[in-house]
Amino acid sequence: MKNRIMLVAALLVAGVAQALACTNFIVGKGASKDGSVIVSYSADSYGLFGELYHYPAAKHAKDAMRKIYEWDTGKFLGEIKEAPETYNVIGNMNEYQVTIGETTFGGRHELHDSKGIMDYGSLIYVALQRSRTAKEAIKVMTDLVKEYGYYSSGESFSIADPNEAWILEMIGKGEGVKGAVWVAVRIPDDCIAAHANQARIHQFPLDDKENCLYSPDVISFAREKGYFSGLNKDFSFANAYCPLDFGGLRACESRVWSFFNMFNKEAGEKYLPYIEAKTKEPMPLYIKPDNKVSVRDIQRAMRDHYEGTPLDITNDLGATAYKMPYRLSPLTFEVNGQKYFNERPISTQQSAFTFVAQMRADLPNAVGGVLWFGTDDANMMVFTPVYCCTNRLPKCYSSEIADCVTFSWESAFWIYNWVADMIRPRYSLMIDDMRAVQNKLEDTYEDAQAGIESAAKAMYEKDPAKAVAFLTNYTEMTAQCAVDSWKKLGEYIIVKYNDGVIKKTNEDGTFMRPRYEQGHGAPVIRPGYPKEFLEEIVKATGDRYKVY
């Protein structure tokens, strides 16, 4: 999300945590269980308010202009010509199921152009309003930066439709130089791919227009700048425009590795030494999974903290007594002049919103495109179905009732954050209560999907407007149901874990009452601390707390 802070080779610098943001996963239609193309995205940025964006379909006057504001800051950048017609966009998917996500890789800082008009966020939402296919979106985005200039630092974009998925990587040409250098590679249908704030495209085919597109000067510009001097066939976009450093490896590529490791154990084992900086062979842009992948699999992947791998962060002192899989920002720290770091997992507390986009070619667009969406950290919220035809925002996902500094009990973002911030400090004690509610809701939405879509498809064949209204209402209902359930969960957690103890419950989950009717104290359990944590306290304090 935010421009990436440049890292020194072999060491992370202090304060980098706030800049290393966002993760994208991609699943080709031949790699998914049901033939869906799947794209996931977490918008990870401290201070960003999590909301669902909506741009209604519209017709525009011939000479209409559009004002462009930087997505991150709201800064006015300039104006561009408006398209005659723009399409309905809900979140990061449009009415034709075209979906776009991103991660910022930053790259060479000297290539930033402060005079450019198109920032990465505007590229996403303008392209969604103007494109019917992924390839068309790539053309819209690259044409826009060519005509109006590119304002942001280096970006990786996931661009997909019901039939194909691409990764587009782009970086500017420097101050006052209009345009960008870029390359786009199609992900094979039977493969999965990922990017996470480090440029991922190395060598690419120079003569395969069906599967690879690139700017005419992507190699020659690198030669002019002194970034590359070899043969064209050996050119690596990533090496030229975003040389890998320790931060890019351990805070960024490690998330890609974790995703690959989940779905292809051989690849996980092969590239673990690369992540540990023991070997230099980079991971491929895409791999084949061991088994077909589902939407629920990708939802779970977005909740990953390296559990069960050598990068697991739940078993050291930083996890505290209750195995918290999070670390506070910044991720780097210094002790006696030596710099250290904490791992940066896929799931992280600063996520504003996360989605898993499901695109299907065997259904009408209005029914086939589902943005499984939630605000806050994927691990601590519920993915609810948002159909791409939705033409009205669920109130709980709207910025009209709350913002980044305005709390509301009606806001999904603040309700999810409220509960998450209670759970994290005592994670292992409390997480099962949250997971039970989360699983129940997501199981319900998954089980209902086929029936809802069958009914919607039948409606669509007779009256498309009726189907759109039906799916819009369903989108609103499921979002609100999740928020209402989360409020009750928060109330339950406050009561159950008040004052550091655990109130006892009956078999049906209700709280035990005092033994006598006039009693005022509920039965409680005093959990204390795990044995391993107590042993660490004794090691650190010696006889300080010894009982004589």
Task: Go through the PLM ranges and name each one.
Residues 5-15:
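Sec-dependent N-terminal signal peptides
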Residues 22-120, 140-293:
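A contiguous strand-loop segment
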Residues 124-130:
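Short, well-ordered beta-strand elements within core beta-sheets of diverse protein domains
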Residues 221-374:
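Glycine-rich, aromatic-lined ligand/substrate-binding cores of catalytic
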Residues 322-458:
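Substrate-recognition/cap regions that form aromatic- and gly/pro-loop-enriched pockets
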Residues 438-548:
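Histidine-centered catalytic/metal-binding microenvironments
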